[in-house]
Amino acid sequence: MKTQFVILMITVILMQMLVQTEGGILGKLWEGFKSIVGKRGLNDRDQLDDLFDSDLSDADIKLLKEMFK
């Protein structure tokens, strides 16, 4: 009975260590993914939002339309 209890306690401790380590690893992977994609990539944005920017001139819009034909 004592042996089973010791094995159970060691298993519980190892499982807790695994869960804490996995959370750290998954957290770091998620941070890396977010830094690669960036803020705009994770937002639900239309790709044509820049066309409505007031800083774009008519020539810029014409060039963009030619590029995407």
UniProtKB/Swiss-Prot annotation:
<feature type="signal peptide">
    <location>
        <begin position="1"/>
        <end position="23"/>
    </location>
</feature>
<dbReference type="GO" id="GO:0031640">
    <property type="term" value="P:killing of cells of another organism"/>
</dbReference>
<dbReference type="GO" id="GO:0016020">
    <property type="term" value="C:membrane"/>
</dbReference>
<keyword id="KW-1052">Target cell membrane</keyword>
<feature type="propeptide">
    <location>
        <begin position="41"/>
        <end position="69"/>
    </location>
</feature>
<comment type="similarity">
    <text>Belongs to the non-disulfide-bridged peptide (NDBP) superfamily. Short antimicrobial peptide (group 4) family.</text>
</comment>
<dbReference type="GO" id="GO:0042742">
    <property type="term" value="P:defense response to bacterium"/>
</dbReference>
<feature type="modified residue" description="Valine amide">
    <location>
        <position position="37"/>
    </location>
</feature>
<keyword id="KW-0295">Fungicide</keyword>
<protein>
    <recommendedName>
        <fullName>Pantinin-1</fullName>
    </recommendedName>
</protein>
<dbReference type="GO" id="GO:0005576">
    <property type="term" value="C:extracellular region"/>
</dbReference>
<keyword id="KW-0964">Secreted</keyword>
<comment type="function">
    <text>Amphipathic peptide that possesses relatively strong activities against Gram-positive bacteria and a fungus, but has very weak antimicrobial activities against Gram-negative bacteria. Also exhibits very low hemolytic activities against human erythrocytes (64 uM induce 21% of hemolysis).</text>
</comment>
<dbReference type="GO" id="GO:0050832">
    <property type="term" value="P:defense response to fungus"/>
</dbReference>
<keyword id="KW-0044">Antibiotic</keyword>
<keyword id="KW-0027">Amidation</keyword>
<dbReference type="GO" id="GO:0044218">
    <property type="term" value="C:other organism cell membrane"/>
</dbReference>
<keyword id="KW-0732">Signal</keyword>
<keyword id="KW-0472">Membrane</keyword>
<keyword id="KW-0165">Cleavage on pair of basic residues</keyword>
<keyword id="KW-0929">Antimicrobial</keyword>
<keyword id="KW-1053">Target membrane</keyword>
